[in-house]
């Protein structure tokens, strides 16, 4: 790489790492690198977003979907600051992302120059690798190390580079590192396998809690569950690891979860945690033996007191553990859970078919599921929309579900669909958003238009921050500042050069989704829905008490008496 500029070296190395596009916004502290990207535009495409937050969210979503490094680029100062939300999303969900941040000219660093901030200090908490590049010669080595670390530690790597360094010639050979990361298979230890197998063999009511660590072990998970006669509950980021209608599947756990999952957790005599660090202790059983499988030893016992642990690669570990356990012939617990889940499906599917005005979000999601391709990518935003998609979109084994699960940042839906369409263009990319989440990033709909991405954006529009309203009410408070000024999102889409479709009636849903999903341009389907409360699968006494307090306050202060369906509430309570 001698006699090449640092910018040239960077573009070549990114290509060697398999990167074919970079998200960001051009500007004065990265102009020299932008020039190199212009030269390499046929191999390394620059995707111009309208906000750096969207660039980082898209890079994170791409990494979650493909497992490959996502790359975003910003100028110094405000541009770098804007990256943080998306980078924290990548950190929280363990997605490998590289952020390249421009910096003021090297001769001005440390002099409080225009747009100068202390980038290393700012990125310190979010990054697993964080370096400021001080010479052209060091940049190739640092870039390789940054990407390798992002992969190995499943997190964010940041390189801060002054613009003049991109144009500086590299005066020496060779490069002492190579653009390669070899992922090893961590084999489980025999003594760990024996101990875990003993607990599983002795259990009469084992239950599996599967996390996103099982995404590369779907087949192994089902084979293990069948032999252990264990029902499977999944965390939100693991949605799709098990097909929703599989007989072992009990749905999600927590606020977005199902009643069968909650009740099975209460009844189990062994908790088997696979590839998850589920944080909500209140939804896990009390004083129950637990075993945990994870590739990261620091995760074992982090959230729940485990009796035995297994540190290994998910697929390899499950295959070996399955060989060690006995086939469980007593399947009464599994059969009872399957029966309870079927009752749950029967109950919630009534909401999907009931004719109502305004529309229910459950109806919208059910019709979308019927219209979506068998290998569609669902990029789901944060809010009540997360609840409806987690419960009512019944995924198969070929579909993917991406979401900001741990940081839970609103506005992730549209960037995720953009990333999905760019990285896997042969698949349908569908963003499912609330009006609150979409409005946070709606300025980037023109990005999809500009790059001719045939994404579909479905907006569940209740003119409200529904999850926040519900949380306020459950605390016993009257909802305040949750109503949103409505926007005609279909008209907005048309003004951006996309197709806009407004839906207000049930009979309009299927034609709207068919048109959107078969279009060769971005389409926004703006669906007006009622303000349906996202009742948890199992209502706790504390939630019922808080909501009762809200109803009394609302009656005496506003002369309004509002509550969800009594029949539905009683079924969730008892």
Curated annotation (Swiss-Prot):
Residue stretches in coiled coil: 28-55
Binding site for FAD: 256-277, 294-313
SS bonds (residue pairs): none
Molecular function GO labels: catalytic activity; magnesium ion binding; thiamine pyrophosphate binding
UniProt KW Hydrolase keyword: no
Induction: Transcriptionally regulated by SigB.
Binding residues for Mg(2+): 435, 462
Keywords: Coiled coil, FAD, Flavoprotein, Magnesium, Metal-binding, Thiamine pyrophosphate
Residues involved in thiamine diphosphate binding: 52
Region (Thiamine pyrophosphate binding): 384-464
Pfam families: TPP_enzyme_C (PF02775), TPP_enzyme_M (PF00205), TPP_enzyme_N (PF02776)
Cited InterPro entries: DHS-like_NAD/FAD-binding_dom (IPR029035), POXB-like (IPR047211), THDP-binding (IPR029061), Thiamin_PyroP_enz_cen_dom (IPR012000), Thiamin_PyroP_enz_TPP-bd_dom (IPR012001), TPP-bd_CS (IPR000399), TPP_enzyme_TPP-bd (IPR011766), TPP_POXB-like (IPR047212)
Gene3D superfamilies recorded: 3.40.50.970, TPP-binding domain
Cofactors demanded by this protein: Mg(2+); thiamine diphosphate
Cofactor remark from the record: Binds 1 Mg(2+) ion per subunit. Binds 1 thiamine pyrophosphate per subunit.
Protein family according to the UniProt entry: Belongs to the TPP enzyme family.
Name of this protein: Putative thiamine pyrophosphate-containing protein YdaP
Organism encoding this protein: Bacillus subtilis (strain 168)
